[in-house]
């Protein structure tokens, strides 16, 4: 199976087009006001239309309430929901039932203890995304360009696909995939020139490197 490549935090038509044309499988739109990649729903809707089924649209939220999820699902019509907060397994199960959409749950990793929640989320999610645990004073729980120790995933044995993220770029994506044996990879900061500013060339380089890995 080919590596699942997700480019997250797209905010412009140009960079979205670069990601889709270069063959991204999943394109992520962030709905979290404190993020430099936050989108309002009308603009996300316009970007979503541009995708035209060429990639899966992923709506990333952080402990979103039902009203926000209703609005996102109604307007963007995402193919996936990504939960990057402290959504419980019960909340994941309930949202899946309400919207009938697959869910990717982010698990924040800093040490081996962080993996103890895996069985509970693996029972309800469709994909798991391993990301670096943010520092306590971080203003957002992801998209920080920080990596975790990939060797922590050694021995992880999931029946569902998982993606690795956090501090990955074209230069280290092959190593990230080799060490973690992940089915996919997710990047945001690693294809940016500054937080929130994606670069079409960096996106293309990243996708090429991920495909070659
Ligand atoms: O991107 C954000 O600003 C963001 C805000 C709130 C929660 C999650 C967020 N991003 C997560 C991602 O973009 C990816 O899933 C991943 O963490 C990318 O990490 P990195 O390549 O290190 O930026």
UniProtKB/Swiss-Prot annotation:
Organism superkingdom: Bacteria
Keyword annotations from UniProtKB, A to Z: Amino-acid biosynthesis, Aromatic amino acid biosynthesis, Isomerase, Tryptophan biosynthesis
InterPro entries, A to Z: Aldolase_TIM, PRAI_dom, RibuloseP-bd_barrel, TrpF_fam
Enzyme Commission number, as recorded: 5.3.1.24
Catalytic reaction(s) noted: N-(5-phospho-beta-D-ribosyl)anthranilate = 1-(2-carboxyphenylamino)-1-deoxy-D-ribulose 5-phosphate
Gene Ontology biological process terms, A to Z: L-tryptophan biosynthetic process
Keyword hit for Nucleotide-binding: no
One Pfam family cited in the UniProt record for this chain: PRAI
Pathways involved: Amino-acid biosynthesis; L-tryptophan biosynthesis; L-tryptophan from chorismate: step 3/5
Keyword Lipoprotein: no
Any one GO molecular function term: phosphoribosylanthranilate isomerase activity
Family: Belongs to the TrpF family.
NCBIfam families assigned: PRK01222.1-1
Name of the molecule in the record: N-(5'-phosphoribosyl)anthranilate isomerase
Organism in which the protein naturally occurs: Rhodopseudomonas palustris (strain ATCC BAA-98 / CGA009)
Lineage of source species: Bacteria, Pseudomonadati, Pseudomonadota, Alphaproteobacteria, Hyphomicrobiales
């Amino acid at each position: 199976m080919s590596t699942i490549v997700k480019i997250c935090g797209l905010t412009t038509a140009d960079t979205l087009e670069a990601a889709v044309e270069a063959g991204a499988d999943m394109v992520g739109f962030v709905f979290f006001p404190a993020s430099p990649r936050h989108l309002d729903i009308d603009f996300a809707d316009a970007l979503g239309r541009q995708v035209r089924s060429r990639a899966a649209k992923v709506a990333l939220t952080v402990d979103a309430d039902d009203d926000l999820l209703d609005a996102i699902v109604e307007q963007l019509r995402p193919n996936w929901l990504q939960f990057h907060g402290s959504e419980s397994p019960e909340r994941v199960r309930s949202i899946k039932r309400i919207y009938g959409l697959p869910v990717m749950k982010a698990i924040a990793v800093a040490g081996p203890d962080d993996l103890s929640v895996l069985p509970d989320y693996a029972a309800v999610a469709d994909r798991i995304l391993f990301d670096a645990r943010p520092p306590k004073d971080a203003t957002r729980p992801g998209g920080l360009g920080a990596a975790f120790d990939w060797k922590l995933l050694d021995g992880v044995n999931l029946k569902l696909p998982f993606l690795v993220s956090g501090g990955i770029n074209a230069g280290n994506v092959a190593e990230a995939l080799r060490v973690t044996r992940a089915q996919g990879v997710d990047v945001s900061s690693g294809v940016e020139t500054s937080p929130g500013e994606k670069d079409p060339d960096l996106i293309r380089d990243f996708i090429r490197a991920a495909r070659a890995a």
